[in-house]
Amino acid sequence: MNKKDNFVNIFDTSIASLNVGDYIIMDAVTKQLSTISNLPQTVTLPTHDHFGREGRRLLSLAKYSIVGGTNLLSSHVTQYRQWRFRMTDLLFLKKCILMGVGWWQYQDKPDRVTKFILKHILHNEMLHSVRDSFTLKQLHSIGITNVINTGCPTMWDLTPEHCCNIPREKGRRVLFTLTDYNQDLSADALLINTLKRHYDEVLFWPQGSEDIHYMNTFSTDIRNGLKILRPSLSELNANLMLKETDYVGTRLHAGIRALQLRARTIIIGVDNRAIEKAKDFNLPVLKRDAILELENMIVEPL
């Protein structure tokens, strides 16, 4: 057997990540890949850190590489690069297949350097899957057309049958999130106070490493009565699985995890990822600039 038939690389966005959302993504990627009966052995490589000598060797030997679920594409790779590779890595970084990958944020058409790099990196025969229509259009604009919009792998099991079992009526307790890098003190204070008015128990789960510091910038009156959870995926899972627990918050993948666990969910859209998913897949998203509508969404059946 040819060495290149022996294994495939999986770019793992949870390696060296301080965002638990990346673990939610990779959990779904791993689950979906496990359904492929003839998938060879898999080897994980980071997206948040550069490759060493062994990483480059694995890239050169693998049959292909799968990039799972994260929003690491951007229009100007020389200015902003979520995917941490050096230009010299392009000698090895080839035949990558996108698996529910998205665009960093709303941007213009990719520049010439980015077009060259993406055409070099991405497999030109295999079909790529992306998170949303915006990412699809961005790739089409530079001539990469072997792409379909499947949504993020975290959403692939959110079938109509699954979603029918998600409560439509408000629960007794709520788990909420905030986003440290996309702050709006006024809107987020309104979010917290609205939750405190309508729920018996209000739990804050920090998905990112700086979310708790953002929470601590709010006044004592706003923070009073909140229960702070540990920033771990197991803590999130355990609390979302408790009966009559809703999810409301700005963290997209915490919201998708809530839907996976059949919790009533309202995602507050603060960037292109949630907003584009709502357009394409009817995800329950309320734009943050419409936060005054949250109260009605909480009390009325979803």
Regions found by a protein language model. Give the residues of each.
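Active-site anion-handling motifs in enzyme catalytic cores
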Residues: 1-302
